[in-house]
């Protein structure tokens, strides 16, 4: 058996012999002497692929829901590609995001299907689908294990020029207002900035959904054009300044998570190398993870420690009636097409499993 001491002595002898041979070779001018090669230096490519990506969100919110992802992607792409990030309405109005991406004005978009007016039957499930989820983790599970990923891919696969890439969860939906809401009757007549599908449902109770440019919302609340927002959860309300102009926060939430997606122009996406495509997919996953943590922690902390808004609540008996009403709303959306029926069925199946699973999935 070779002993450690013998091995070290032998290795040292080989090293000395190699150095001697190299020295003799150099002194004798022999061309076949061993040569040391310079270390490889990685250089950035000269031709950079540039993308323009616009998000639905304004800059204060975008600093969390997408900016870290894009900065990390640009760094990791090492000069092969650079994504220029634009916020709500900077290049095109939010409701024109889809068409702008389809015609190549934009290379990619981050938005929900409904807000950007996607011409697909399933767009009603983008954003806030009332009472479809309890927690933000529900959303990725629905896409991964209950078939929503295949349904979304099928729907957008029928439209030329656009690729659906990935979906993820954002925050729960609460209502923030200047005047308190302590009963369902208090919803009547309140003009709120809100997302399409949830707004349509809440209009059953007299709430008035209003669409305005994202950056105009704070001023619209201050001037009385709006009575509040039904667009987000506590984290966003505090982050973007809406908590500064709203006095009350309704604890009853309309759903547990906002459903948003990433999309790309087909030509822009197909022009990328497989490596860059995978890198962008990884960056989307990193953004999904960032949002899960940011929202989950923020919602709880601000409910407990936030001091800008007074918390109100609609009594459970009244709110249970609203939840029950959502069943007919689900059926209404299911009747749009065979595909929307599949989506509703997936949500129903998932809800059944979660309720049957019990704590901690449902309480």
PLM segments and residue spans:
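N-terminal secretory/targeting leader peptides
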Residues: 2-138, 157-158, 162-363
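Short, solvent-exposed secondary-structure boundary motifs
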Residues: 151-157
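A gly/proline- and charged-residue-enriched helix-loop-helix capping module
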Residues: 136-151
């Amino acid at each position: 058996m070779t002993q450690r001491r013998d091995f070290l002595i032998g290795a040292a002898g080989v090293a000395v012999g190699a150095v001697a041979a190299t020295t003799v070779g150099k002194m004798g001018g022999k061309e076949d002497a061993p040569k040391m090669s310079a270390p490889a230096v990685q250089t950035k490519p000269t031709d950079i692929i540039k993308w323009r990506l616009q998000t639905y969100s304004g800059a204060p919110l975008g600093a969390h829901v997408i900016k870290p992802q894009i900065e990390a992607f640009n760094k990791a792409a090492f000069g092969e590609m650079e994504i220029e990030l634009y916020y709500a309405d900077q290049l095109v109005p939010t409701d024109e995001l889809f068409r702008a991406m389809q015609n190549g004005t934009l290379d990619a978009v981050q938005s929900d299907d409904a807000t950007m007016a996607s011409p697909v039957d399933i767009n009603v499930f983008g954003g806030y689908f009332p009472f479809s989820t309890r927690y933000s983790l529900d959303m990725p599970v629905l896409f991964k294990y209950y078939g929503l990923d295949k349904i979304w891919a099928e729907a957008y696969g029928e439209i030329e020029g656009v690729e659906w890439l990935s979906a993820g969860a954002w925050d729960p939906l609460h209502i923030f207002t200047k005047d308190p809401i302590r009963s369902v009757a208090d919803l009547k007549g309140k003009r709120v900035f809100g997302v399409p599908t949830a707004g349509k449902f809440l209009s059953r109770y007299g709430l008035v959904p209003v669409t305005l440019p994202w950056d105009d919302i704070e001023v619209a609340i201050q001037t009385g054009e709006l009575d509040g927002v039904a667009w987000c959860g506590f984290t966003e309300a505090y982050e973007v300044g809406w908590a500064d102009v709203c006095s009350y926060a309704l604890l009853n939430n309309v759903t547990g998570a906002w459903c948003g997606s990433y999309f790309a122009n087909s030509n822009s996406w197909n022009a990328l190398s497989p490596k860059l495509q995978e890198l962008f997919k990884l960056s989307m996953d990193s953004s999904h993870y960032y949002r899960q943590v940011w929202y989950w922690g923020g919602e709880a902390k601000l409910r407990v420690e936030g001091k800008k808004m007074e918390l109100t609540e609609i009594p459970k008996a009244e709110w249970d009636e609203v939840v029950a009403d959502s069943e007919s709303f689900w059926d209404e959306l299911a009747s749009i097409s065979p595909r929307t029926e599949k989506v509703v069925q997936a949500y129903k199946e998932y809800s059944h499993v979660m309720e049957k699973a019990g704590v901690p999935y449902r309480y």
